[in-house]
UniProtKB/Swiss-Prot annotation:
Documented EC number(s): 6.1.1.21
Family annotation (SUPFAM superfamilies): Class II aaRS ABD-related (SSF52954), Class II aaRS and biotin synthetases (SSF55681)
PANTHER family referenced in this protein's UniProt entry, alphabetically: HISTIDINE--TRNA LIGASE, MITOCHONDRIAL-RELATED, HISTIDYL-TRNA SYNTHETASE
Recorded family membership: Belongs to the class-II aminoacyl-tRNA synthetase family.
Entry keyword annotation includes Plastid: no
PROSITE patterns in alphabetical order: AA_TRNA_LIGASE_II
Designated name of the protein: Histidine--tRNA ligase
Source organism (scientific name): Saccharolobus islandicus (strain M.16.27)
Top-level EC class: ligase
């Protein structure tokens, strides 16, 4: 007989594990709505080129790619930002700016499965399109920080930030092609600094610039005053990147005033190739990987054929975030089992269940043909707190019996008093 199991790198989530995911989703959704964001749901399947165009080397190598019956090259989405950008061009380009969108969905990457890395996983994220101001960047970071604050993680996390515009501007100034820029940044992201510097040396042929690159790439934890000092260096002015350092200084100073924990890492690069300015990741001391990340991508929408539109966003790794939460208590409704003692009680069983479900109780109707002496301990062992028992005598008097399955306290009351009776027994 054939035995089917989950595909490698993918996982079933059942009961409390599924509820934890939905709980995180509800926290994120409520917060995003309070910040003025509207939900967007995009397809899991998109054209391969949508992601391949600016996804970066690593992403392209891990995509699930296939051809459909019309010979179109398609992909399961490895992330959601490009889908939102495509949907914006297709549906929202003429709408008033900025556009604020949030999403929650599964993504797929053919990575080697390991702790904190899956081939199917969930992302919760936002995108703000049509605003290039520092206020937009701060709003996005504030929302991200507040999400983790609601999970009681704000004292543990730190947001690592950098401005990838520093690297971009230098390479643009010396006419390094986009594909080569992408490769250099990929090497830096993988901590292959020497390889990246070798390529830069071959293309720039300028030792001073290579030395400057090396200098900033090794500044892993830069203080605010260091950024201000760097902005005043002669070589920074010569390379026309003073504004990029001053932006980082302004942003960092305001983040400090907002009591958001962060660190500046001038050697930090993210793997996705579309970032143009601010980049950031959320780190937690209990794991070796980031649990969320994002940045500014001011050229992606134009690259996709839309009008020039600055944009910024982030994605939260849902499963990764759950890994760092020690005690996530999901509030559950009271579990109620409704037991009828004869066929005549069936209509009353359903009527009682309807009443209780309207009041947010979790209600199950008993379908087992067993004596009450076996049913009550069984349902108590399954986590039910209350049993509603409807027998022949109760039915004749329009009464029900409410029993606390933990304390075994029970009372008989008229049907209309069922809610008060449950509260009395709990």
């Amino acid at each position: 007989m054939t035995k089917f199991e989950t595909v490698r790198g993918m996982k079933d989530y059942i009961g409390i594990d599924a509820e934890k995911i939905r709980y995180l989703e509800s926290i994120f959704r409520d917060l995003a709505i309070k910040y003025g964001y509207s939900e967007i749901i995009t397809p899991v399947v998109e054209e391969f080129k949508l992601f391949a165009l600016k996804g970066g080397e690593e992403l392209r190598e891990t995509m699930y790619v296939f051809k459909d019956k019309a010979d179109r090259e398609l992909s399961l989405r490895p992330e959601i930002t490009p889908s939102v950008a495509r949907a914006y061009i297709q549906n929202l380009q003429s709408s008033p700016k900025p556009i604020r969108l949030f999403y929650f969905g599964t993504v797929y990457r053919y990575d080697e499965p390991q702790y904190g890395r899956y081939r199917e996983f969930r992302q919760a994220g936002i995108e703000m399109i049509g605003d290039s101001s520092i206020l937009a960047d701060l709003e996005v970071l504030d929302l991200l920080y507040n999400f983790y604050d609601k999970l009681n993680l704000s004292n543990d996390i730190i947001i690592k930030i950098n401005n990838i515009g520093i690297f971009r501007k230098i390479m643009d100034k010396y006419n390094i092609e986009d594909n080569l820029q992408e490769h250099i940044l990929h090497l830096i992201d993988k901590n292959k600094i020497n390889e990246a510097l070798d390529i830069l040396e071959k293309n720039l042929k300028n030792k001073d610039i290579i030395d400057f690159f090396n200098k900033i790439l090794t500044k892993k934890d830069t203080k605010l005053e260091d950024i201000e000092s760097l902005a005043e260096l002669e070589e920074v002015s010569r390379l026309d990147i003073k504004s990029e350092f001053l932006y980082l200084f302004r942003l960092s100073r305001i983040l400090s005033n907002l009591n958001i924990k962060f660190k500046i890492d001038l050697g930090f690069v993210r793997g996705l190739a579309y970032y143009t300015g601010l980049i950031f990741e959320v780190l937690h001391p209990s794991v070796q990987f980031s649990i969320a990340g994002g940045g500014r991508y001011d050229k992606l929408i134009e690259l996709y054929g839309g009008l020039p539109s600055p944009a910024i966003g982030f994605a939260i790794g849902v499963e990764r975030t759950l890994l760092v939460i020690k005690d996530l208590k999901v509030e559950e409704p009271v579990n109620v089992i409704v037991i009828g003692m004869s066929e005549d009680t069936i209509p009353s069983m359903f009527m009682v269940s309807r009443i209780l479900r309207k009041e947010e109780y979790k209600v199950v109707i008993n379908t087992k043909d067993q004596p009450l002496s076996k049913l009550l301990p069984y349902y108590a062992s399954q986590g039910f707190k209350v049993a509603i028992i409807i027998g022949k005598q109760e039915l004749e008097k329009n009464m029900i019996t409410v029993r606390n399955l933990i304390t075994r306290k029970q009372i008989s009351v008229p049907l209309e008093n069922i809610e008060d009776a449950i509260k009395q027994t709990l």
